[in-house]
Amino acid sequence: MWFALNPISTTLKTTLFAWLPPGFAATSSADAAGLLGYPRSALLLTFGAYLILNGLAGPIVEELYFRGYLLPRLSRFGRKAPLLETLLFTVYHFWQPWLYPTILAAFAALVFPIYRTRNIYVGMWAHCLLNLSGGLALTALVLGGAA
């Protein structure tokens, strides 16, 4: 799904959000170049913390809140509850507006099974794997250029 929606996100980022400073949304080697002025030890420490916080802690807390707490409370909206919850989750990622189409599609596909089975653990695993894979790719991109 990411591969299908990546051209849309890239177009949004390079047109509508082109005013963002380099490194704010490091998704390519050109974006990551702004981070290369820092010492390798600082980058290792930063990306180590990033992987723990954004790859594990953040997704678990988000899933506990959005799918564990909020989704059951939105059930009064019936079949619209998963879509409403996904829209709220997408807007919650306000600092990444170029990724809204990707977040909306990826988590819409994830939230319906969670809503049906009332089991958030699959969502936690998927969300952690998604964030860890992106974080590891970003880490490799930046640290590969800092070698």
Per-range role (PLM):
Residues 7, 35-147:
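Transmembrane helix-loop-helix hairpins at the membrane interface
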Residues 12-43:
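Membrane-interface interhelical connector segments
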